[in-house]
From Swiss-Prot:
CDD domains: Hb-beta-like (cd08925). GO terms for cellular component: blood microparticle; haptoglobin-hemoglobin complex; hemoglobin complex. This is Hemoglobin cathodic subunit beta. GO terms for biological process: hydrogen peroxide catabolic process. Belongs to the globin family. Keywords: Heme, Iron, Metal-binding, Oxygen transport, Transport. Residues 2-146 form the Globin domain. Pfam families: Globin. Red blood cells.
């Protein structure tokens, strides 16, 4: 994937304003609420029985933050995302049997959370660049499936 300097600037600018401890848990909880079948991967996380339980679950919050911190590594290594996610892709495919479409769903949930957080500052251009970044991350996480 080729990244223009303006695209790199948009991605790094967005991430400079992201609080992983806030946005990550919101995105993961949104995924688990909107797509309840994804909860099957998180059986050890405790109570996932309601929206309130999901939003207040400390394990969901920690994992959401960790996922966002992993994405931050991708921001810092935009030219090498597939190699960066090689180990996580192998674990997600071979050990956890995660449906790769769930990565896209999580990326969509993250996009929604960012749009809500940034409002008008999350311009259509920013969203287009962000969606490109999400597609690269999803591709990196999905490469073990194909």
């Amino acid at each position: 994937v080729q990244w223009s300097s303006s695209e790199r600037s948009v991605i790094s600018g967005l991430w400079a304003k992201v609080n992983a401890a806030e946005v990550g848990p919101q995105a993961l909880a949104r995924l688990l609420v909107l797509y309840p079948w994804t909860q099957r991967y998180f059986g050890k996380f405790g109570d996932l029985s309601s929206n309130a339980a999901l939003m207040g679950n400390a394990n969901v919050a920690k994992h959401g933050k960790d996922l966002l911190l992993a994405d931050l590594k991708a921001v810092k290594n935009m030219d090498n995302v597939k190699a960066l996610y090689a180990k996580x892709x192998x674990x997600x495919x071979x050990e956890l049997n995660v449906d790769p479409d769930n990565f896209t769903l999580l990326g969509d949930c993250l996009t929604i959370v960012l749009a809500m957080k940034f409002g008008a500052d999350f311009t259509p251009v920013d969203q287009a660049v962000w969606q490109k970044f999400v597609a690269v991350v999803v591709s990196g996480l999905s490469k073990q499936y194909f």
